[in-house]
Amino acid sequence: MAHLASSFASYETFLRGADAFWSVDLGAMNNSGVTGDALLSVNTEEDGTRYLNISISAAGLTPDVRHAQHVHGTFDAEGNPSDARMPVIADDADQDGFVEVLEGLAAYGDILLPLTDGDGVLPMTRSDGTMNFIQSYELGDASNFFSPVSGNDYTAADLMPVENREIVLHVQSVGSGFGEGTGGEINGSQDGYVGLLPVAAGEIEGTNRAQALDILED
């Protein structure tokens, strides 16, 4: 059951046999207009192997480009998991009108799990700016858990409790001139595609099978 095709029919099959369920209501960041939701579920195979399956559906994204997306998480001073949150405009330290990726770090934390397909490829949006993504990750495979930004390695234990974690989507087209004289990815020199800029985020919340199936159907 773990190695499912990347389709909503296959994910429905996974949900019906899953042990735990979570959902995410993705909210727009940086005036992107992005909307969407995500589902997460865990299934335990007969041999004890556990898989995390994640589906993301989003609209309002920059069309026809690959979008980075991750599960992020924060830790306290002792290294214990803390509650990540969606950044707000008050996190815009350089006051250029954009909460850039590093400015949001205190809110959502480091990348714990990059959300790519089985070949490590980022998902591509359609020409209408929509995206659907489904992928399974073996929780016992530590190679799944790392940050391409900080270089830190993580494990599935760092992902827990899942309710403390955040999903963040990136990539926006931003015209030249915005943020001129400031640092970060919006510094006035950009002209179009900005791969790092966060465009949507949402806190992971617990749900149940019936609600998860309803979200999938919608």
Q: What is each model feature region?
A:
Residues 1-216:
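N-terminal leader/targeting pre-sequences
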